[in-house]
Structure formats: C-alpha cells, structure tokens
C-alpha cells in the first residue's frame, strides 16, 4: 500500500494527533462486534436487550453472565498489529490522544496509556445502586465456551447487585470522557477514525467536528462508511494491515 506525500507530511507536521477507534479494531483480535449474531447460550437472545438497563433489571444473572462471557473472550484474546501500531505512533508525534468506543483492554495491553473510554470498560464494574467500584478477581473467569447465566456479585457497601461498567443503550456517555474527547477533537491537527462505522452517536460526530474545523481526518476501514464524505483520506483495508504500513512509511519519510 502506498501513501501520499501530503498525508505523510500532515502526520509529520501534526502537533496533536487524535485516534478514534471502534469495534472493527478489536474484531481483528477475534472479539465479536455488537452487530454480530449471538451464538451458544445467547443465540436466542437479542443483544440490544442484554445491553440495556431494562434487561439487567429484569434478569441480572442473564445480563451479568453475558458480560462475563464477553470479558472472558477479551481476556483470552491478544492485541493485534493495529493496537501495537497505534501505541507506537504515540512515540512518533508530540502528542497523541486515544479515544475508543471499545470496552476491552486491548489498547492498554498493547502499550497505549490512558485511552478515553466513551463506552466504559468490561473490566471496571460498579454497583448498580450506589455506583461504588467493584474489584474483579484476577485471572480469566472459568466460563464455558458457549456462556451461561451467572449471578452478579453484591456491593460490599450497600448490598445491591454489581453491574457491568459499560454504557448501555439509552444511557448517557460518561461526562468526563465525552468532554475530554470533544476537547481533543477541537484541538487536534489530525484525527484517525479506525474501524468504526460512524453510525453510533454521539461519538460518531467527533470526526465530523474535526473536519468542520478544517483539520485533517484519516479514515481506516475496509468498507465505505458515513464518514467517507468528511474524511480527507480514506484508507481502505483492515486496520491491522494499514496502520503498521503507515507507521513504517511515516518513519521512512522523516529526514
């Protein structure tokens, strides 16, 4: 894959790069996306019901079991070349802000520090009533391949069931994370949008905000998305292939 001189110059000259990642990045590590069909124990359930406050209120064991199954899948997965290239890019620019819609920890395991998590984390549950954080036991849960119902633990402070630390459908994004993401979008010289459909709002407005400011948007995606018209560069391909090649080209282009 070849990259234009203009793109490489924009990367070299950027004082602040923002990287916005979606489910497509984690999918290359074998993590199912939210739109993938459910399998095993979950095949007769709707993900939009499981990922909702109403679903948890109706059947906490069903919802907690689904998220423990998902967390198990994540902990058994490994970061892919896109995760590592994004982490390495931080050492090649004055400032890099990583914003992710993903709820796994693959960015951190690849070496990225302090990503802004718009949709929360599978690894940081909290009390469903008083919101006290709950510390998960170390290691990988002993969950069957197909999944199962699991009663959620109880909060040590108030006794209410612990809930997954993610943003469910209908819930607001964490205000601090959203404010930090918007600030990065308003300040950066260049934003990568990688592996995201650009359909999930309000997060999807971040690249469009960058484009409206006249800053550069670079989209990395194997398929067309709603962002195509806003992006200055559309790099077609899997992030795990495109990002390492782009990082190599950037380093070769430096004097």
From Swiss-Prot:
Binding residues annotated for Zn(2+), in chain numbering: 127, 130, 155, 158
Keyword Transmembrane helix: no
Subcellular location: Cytoplasm
Reaction catalyzed: N(6)-acetyl-L-lysyl-[protein] + NAD(+) + H2O = 2''-O-acetyl-ADP-D-ribose + nicotinamide + L-lysyl-[protein]; N(6)-succinyl-L-lysyl-[protein] + NAD(+) + H2O = 2''-O-succinyl-ADP-D-ribose + nicotinamide + L-lysyl-[protein]
Span of domain Deacetylase sirtuin-type: 1-253
Keywords: Cytoplasm, Metal-binding, NAD, Transferase, Zinc
Entry superkingdom: Bacteria
Annotated binding of NAD(+), by residue: 22-42, 101-104, 195-197, 221-223, 239
A single Gene Ontology CC term: cytoplasm
Cofactor: Zn(2+)
Cofactor note: Binds 1 zinc ion per subunit.
GO MF: histone deacetylase activity, NAD-dependent; NAD+ binding; protein-malonyllysine demalonylase activity; protein-succinyllysine desuccinylase activity; zinc ion binding
Binding site for substrate: 67, 70
InterPro entries named in the record: DHS-like_NAD/FAD-binding_dom, NAD-dep_sirtuin_deacylases, Sirtuin, Sirtuin_cat_small_dom_sf, Sirtuin_class_III, Ssirtuin_cat_dom
Primary site of residence: cytoplasm
Pfam family of the protein (one): SIR2
Active-site residues, Swiss-Prot/TrEMBL: 119
E.C. number: 2.3.1.286
Function: NAD-dependent lysine deacetylase and desuccinylase that specifically removes acetyl and succinyl groups on target proteins. Modulates the activities of several proteins which are inactive in their acylated form.
Family: Belongs to the sirtuin family. Class III subfamily.
PANTHER family noted in UniProt: NAD-DEPENDENT PROTEIN DEACYLASE SIRTUIN-5, MITOCHONDRIAL-RELATED
Record's comment describing the protein's domains: 2 residues (Tyr-67 and Arg-70) present in a large hydrophobic pocket are probably involved in substrate specificity. They are important for desuccinylation activity, but dispensable for deacetylation activity.
Protein name: NAD-dependent protein deacylase
Classification lineage: Bacteria, Pseudomonadati, Pseudomonadota, Gammaproteobacteria, Methylococcales
